[in-house]
Amino acid sequence: MFKQILGKLPKKTSAKFWDNGESQTLDNNNNQGGGDEVLSQRTSSNGDTSLDCVSSFDVLPRLRDVSISEKQELFLKKLRLCCLVFDFVAEPQQNFKEKEIKRQTLLEVVDYVISSGNGKFPESVIQEATKMISANLFSNPHRQWKNKTPEALDLEEEEGSLNPSWPHLQIVYEFLLRIVASPNTDPKISKKYIDHTFVLKLLDLFDSEDPREREYLKTILHRIYGRFMVHRPFIRKTMNNILYDFIFETGKHSGIAEFLEVLGSIINGFALPLKEEHKLFLTRVLIPLHKLKCLPNYHQQLSYCVIQFVEKDCKLADTVIRGMLKYWPVTNSAKEIMFLNELEEILEATQLTEFERCMVPLSRQIAQCLSSSHFQVAERALYLWNNDHVTNLVRQNSRIILPIVFPALEKNGSSHWNQAVKNLTENVLKVLSDTNPDLFEECLHKFQEDQQKAEDTKKKNGETWRQLEEIVASMAK
């Protein structure tokens, strides 16, 4: 990724920097970098690094052009320079040269982190690095762009807006990723600066509409969770709170899929037996996430998290299946197919004992899916019988399950409008007939009796209505 960023750089930049619209030309005689100079900002006494507070600039050499003893101090100066934040939203056409100089400086500090030796970064480096990262990632100018989206725009139908500050932000994210992942970063020192406040602000950025930004954040959060064990409970708790707010309050958040992808890795690392707090997370967060209408945006990641729980503790299968039945979509066929896909994967990890606890309500729901006029829903439900494990669970409980699903299958075979559904239904009926012929005949006989009773009742009701109509007609005369 870093090589791709480097490849986009122009070979040379101008040595002119603008300060509030007034140009300052550098004296090339003072250039210590052989034409590749970088500018150092002088800030106000209160440390403000906004563009309005910059008064003058000094020429800085390249890191590769100074001695080893000077590199660290020069690196710190470059980090301070990179704290200067440009407004790409309000002033997109201004300060081109300055923006490019900062971009090159950012690339240089990233390269310094990558190529640094085996020595640990001192506290001063970590402190200045987190200051620079905070100034760029958490600054208002970089966040104003997301409010530019018209209110009438349906965000669920859009791929997301792209952050205009990305030429700088991308490299800052790369720098943060390299710092966090570097073996030269000591977590014991870094946790003082990459603290709860820093992590909380980082998690808030997941609501960015830019998918490139969310992808970086996902990778960085993975690294922070892996290296900073002291922050793990806080990260899980904060993610829970964000998901609670999404489920029960707002219903809108751009980074749910990325959150769940990180959580999938976290769940995968849970030790057995599962803690009660982890089981509560399943029942209070993951299962209710199925009810939102934007489920397609994150269903793949959600399904993975849920299945991880069932694979770790098969006793949770009953809880998960009943939870899914509670939120089963009624009028959304696309979501119904997603539920059936997830259900099959859950059943794959379900043992017989847990299956028997929920098989009656589950069979009723599957029967409704079999009866669906939407052919894809009916097809997906029929495909469950292609799964050997599911078929085995059904076979061992055929006395209870077959009477529930048989009417739907028989009606499909005779009256469904879609020929593919009819063909699949015939195959399933043949499998059920071969598995338990006697029970199959019983179900068929009962179905025919019920059909005859329904027909007789219909005729009787029709005759009753006819007599009532005659009585009313005679009274009218």
UniProtKB/Swiss-Prot annotation:
Gene3D superfamilies documented for this protein: Leucine-rich Repeat Variant (1.25.10.10)
Tissue note: Expressed ubiquitously.
Function field: The B regulatory subunit may modulate substrate selectivity and catalytic activity, and may also direct the localization of the catalytic enzyme to a particular subcellular compartment.
Domain of life from the UniProt record: Eukaryota
Gene field: B'DELTA
Subcellular localization(s) per the UniProt record: Cytoplasm
Main localization category: cytoplasm
InterPro entries: ARM-like, ARM-type_fold, PP2A_B56
Keyword Cytoplasm: yes
Keyword Ion transport part of the UniProt annotation: no
Induction line: Induced by epibrassinolide.
Protein family: Belongs to the phosphatase 2A regulatory subunit B56 family.
Subunit structure: PP2A consists of a common heteromeric enzyme, composed of a catalytic subunit (subunits C), a constant regulatory subunit (subunit A), and a variety of regulatory subunits such as subunits B (the R2/B/PR55/B55, R3/B''/PR72/PR130/PR59 and R5/B'/B56 families). Interacts with SRK2E/OST1.
GO molecular-function term, one example from the UniProt record: protein phosphatase regulator activity
GO biological process: signal transduction
GO CC list: cytoplasm; nucleolus; protein phosphatase type 2A complex
Pfam families for the chain: B56
Protein name (record): Serine/threonine protein phosphatase 2A 55 kDa regulatory subunit B' delta isoform
UniProt KW keywords: Cytoplasm
